[in-house]
Amino acid sequence: MTKVLGITGGIATGKSTVVALFKKAGYPIVDGDIIAREIVAKGQPALAAIVETFGPEIVLTTGELDRKKLGQLIFASPQKRELLNETLKPFLRKEILRQIEEAKKKAALVIVDIPLLYEAHYEAIMDQVAVVYVPEKIQKERLMARNQLTEEEAQQRIASQWPIEMKKERADIVFDNQGTREETEQQVKKWLEEQIGKK
């Protein structure tokens, strides 16, 4: 029986590091960010839905999405960001579910990488949810260093997601990423040994 493990975290908590460790161990990854980009490619139904919602000026002359223009629109307006999310939600969910079913045919464990897993209510389709955790103070420091942000800018980005402590409380598994990469890798290996029987 294939297990479906959803992996989430907060911005700059190290989710990508943990997902990469599962990938290295040979497990298929269903990547929510990649799917979100693919579903709005030229000619896709989700792009047509965006045009219907935001108008034809959101598309370049090539027929592709003008990501810069869309980014400016949704960054300036939380209402427009919410509208975009609502527009894309059914297309995204359908493709994520399709890819999970495909991956389940090939492996004993499928990893589903969704940054806003709890916010978008994907936990119901997972067997378990793992949260990659660091305290908010470290999260903010890492985000400021990684993206060259001021403290205020970093705080704004963190505040746009559920608090990491809240995600930690709801998680079935917590991968603590405060230490070294090696320490995090040991946690992943231990979980794989216990759950999948793979060393």
Curated annotation (Swiss-Prot):
Family annotation (PROSITE patterns): DPCK (PS51219)
Protein residues bound to ATP: 12-17
S-S bridge residues: none
InterPro entries per the UniProt record, alphabetical: Depp_CoAkinase, P-loop_NTPase
Keywords: ATP-binding, Coenzyme A biosynthesis, Cytoplasm, Kinase, Nucleotide-binding, Transferase
The UniProt record lists the keyword Transferase: yes
GO molecular function, one term: ATP binding
GO biological process, one term: coenzyme A biosynthetic process
Ranges of residues in domain DPCK: 4-199
Protein origin, superkingdom: Bacteria
E.C. numbers: 2.7.1.24
One cellular component term from this protein's GO annotations in UniProt: cytoplasm
Principal location listed in the UniProt entry: cytoplasm
Catalytic activity: 3'-dephospho-CoA + ATP = ADP + CoA + H(+)
Compartments where found: Cytoplasm
UniProt keyword Nucleotide-binding, yes or no: yes
NCBIfam families in alphabetical order: dephospho-CoA kinase
UniProt-listed HAMAP family: Dephospho_CoA_kinase
Reported function: Catalyzes the phosphorylation of the 3'-hydroxyl group of dephosphocoenzyme A to form coenzyme A.
Family: Belongs to the CoaE family.
Protein name per its UniProtKB record: Dephospho-CoA kinase
Source organism of this protein record: Enterococcus faecalis (strain ATCC 700802 / V583)
